[in-house]
Amino acid sequence: MPEKMKTIELNGNNFSNLSEFYNEVERKMTSGLNWKIGRNLDAFNDVLSGGFGIHNVDENYQLNWKNAEKSKLDLGWTQTIDFIENKLKTCHPTNIEFVKKDLEDAKNGTGETLWELIIGIIKEHNQIELKLN
């Protein structure tokens, strides 16, 4: 009999901004670490791959995102603009013009929201079956 696929649940009611989202990811997708995961999308991408105490590297699993519509709103344009403004403060000087363009787009409601970026990162992982509830 095939082994049942592991299910990990993120709950949109547990966060309303990017910082709280990272806390939820750490609570639900890591275990036994004596350090905190990075608070950035690259670290999130790494956690999705596994090896942080909840699922093994490249193990197939279902990621159930409860209250996803709330998260879609919470991680919409306002949070996206904040995210890009912070990125502008720390980006390499050669990237400033690109980031400024991203910020202008976000302020005009074009480009990708944080929600869309996060969903895109998840969908890059073939071992993840994403369920939005």
Residue spans for each PLM region:
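N-terminal intrinsically disordered, low-complexity segments enriched in P/E/S/T
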Residues: 1-35, 39, 43, 50-133
